[in-house]
Amino acid sequence: MLNVLIFGAPGSGKGTQSEELIRRYGFRHISTGELLRAEIKAQTELGQAAAGYINEGHLVPDSLIVDMMEKLISTLVDTEGIIFDGFPRTIPQAEAMETMLAHHGWKVDIVLNLQVPEEMLIERLLNRGKISGRSDDNIETIRKRLDVYANETAPLVDFFTRKNVLHNVVGTGTIEEIALRIAPIVDKFRKVSN
C-alpha cells in the first residue's frame, strides 16, 4: 500500500489533485477538511468543538484531529493506497501519524508539496467561496488561514524533507498539467512497492 500526503497552503489544489490521484490510481482519499465539515453538519460533539476553531481561521487542536484519524485509519486495510489531504498539519500530528501508520506496518511514502504563489491562492479561495458558499472563504479568514499555514504547517516541509519523502510540485497551470507533474513521482514509488 502507498501512503501519499498532499500538502500545500489553502487553495493550492490539494482536493483537486487528490481527485486526480483517485481517478488515476484508485487510491482512497482521506480529507480532514471534509471529515470535519461532515461532523459540523451532523452537529456531533467533535463538529461543534471544531466549528469554533474553523470559523475563526484557526487549526483544530491536534488531539481532536489525531483521534478522528486514528479511528479512520484502523478501518483501511484493503486499499491500493491512501491519499491524506489536510493531515498532518503540525509536527505533533506528523509524529502521531507515523506512529499510527507504523502500528499497521505502514509508513509515509510520498509527500507532494503543491507550491502556489500567495496572490493566486487568495484568488482561488475567493472564487471558491463564491461558488461553494463556504463561510471560511472570505478575505479576512483567508489571510488568517494563510498566516496559520505559514506559522504552523509550513514547518512540516523541513520535517518531511529530512525523511527524504518530500517532493515539491509546481501547483500552477491546468489541473491536468499539475497532475502530469505528480504522476511520474507516484509511478516511481508504485513500481518500487510492487
UniProtKB/Swiss-Prot annotation:
Keywords assigned: ATP-binding, Cytoplasm, Kinase, Nucleotide biosynthesis, Nucleotide-binding, Transferase
Annotated binding of ATP, by residue: 11-16, 128, 173
UniProt keyword Transmembrane, yes or no: no
EC numbers, comma separated: 2.7.4.3
Main location: cytoplasm
PROSITE patterns on file: ADENYLATE_KINASE (PS00113)
Name of the top EC class for this enzyme: transferase
Region described as LID: 127-137
Pathway given in the UniProt record: Purine metabolism; AMP biosynthesis via salvage pathway; AMP from ADP: step 1/1
Annotated compartments: Cytoplasm
Comment field on protein domains: Consists of three domains, a large central CORE domain and two small peripheral domains, NMPbind and LID, which undergo movements during catalysis. The LID domain closes over the site of phosphoryl transfer upon ATP binding. Assembling and dissambling the active center during each catalytic cycle provides an effective means to prevent ATP hydrolysis.
Name the UniProt record assigns to this protein: Adenylate kinase
Species in which this protein is naturally found: Porphyromonas gingivalis (strain ATCC 33277 / DSM 20709 / CIP 103683 / JCM 12257 / NCTC 11834 / 2561)
Primary gene name: adk
